[in-house]
Curated annotation (Swiss-Prot):
Cofactor entry: Fe cation
Name used for this protein in its record: S-ribosylhomocysteine lyase
Pfam families, A to Z: LuxS (PF02664)
Keyword Iron assigned: yes
Taxonomic placement: Bacteria, Pseudomonadati, Pseudomonadota, Gammaproteobacteria, Enterobacterales
């Protein structure tokens, strides 16, 4: 099985909250695609609660688009990581990490302004696969934590696992 890019970085030294360019690529037509690792939690030390991350998924995608789309950037998708320590964001364009960090903080401020669980987009059985598994309170606790802690930038060259370590791990 091929080694995925996300498994070539050392999760034991990864900072959070932090933005990292996980991957860049070009489409056959030359469009730049960037995938960002938006790390909310320190890997193997913190985890977002399932109801909170689910609610955040519904809110975060729209709020990030409000703050980041434009000037050559268009978000394709924002999806939670299975490990519940962050989200992956795929987009057209190549915004720098600070622009993404600023949009992320603004999106978290928007999450804190939501006053009622009924205001969560697509919170119904027709548009959500587990519509009863939500918590606005948990999502707002996550958002407050991001704002309080601030958002750093993780650099791949600082996190790269040495080839010897990858060999030792039988990868």
């Amino acid at each position: 099985m091929p080694l995925l890019d996300s498994f070539t970085v050392d999760h034991t030294i990864m900072k959070a909250p932090a933005v990292r360019v996980a991957k860049t690529m070009k489409t056959p037509h030359g469009d730049e695609i960037t995938v960002f690792d938006l790390r909310f939690c320190v890997p193997n030390k913190e985890v977002m609660p399932e109801r909170g991350i689910h609610t955040l998924e519904h809110l975060f995608a729209g709020f990030m688009r409000n703050h980041l789309n434009g000037n050559g950037v268009e978000i394709i998708d924002i999806s939670p990581m299975g490990c519940r320590t962050g989200f992956y964001m795929s987009l057209i364009g190549t915004p720098d990490e600070q622009r993404v960090a600023d949009a992320w903080k603004a999106a978290m401020a928007d999450v804190l302004k939501v006053t009622d669980q009924r205001k969560i987009p697509e919170l119904n059985e027709y548009q959500c696969g587990t519509y009863h598994m939500h918590s606005l309170e948990e999502a707002q606790e996550i958002a407050k934590g991001i704002i309080d802690r601030g958002v750093r930038i993780n650099h791949n060259e600082e996190l790269a696992l040495p080839k010897e370590k990858l060999t030792e791990l039988h990868i």
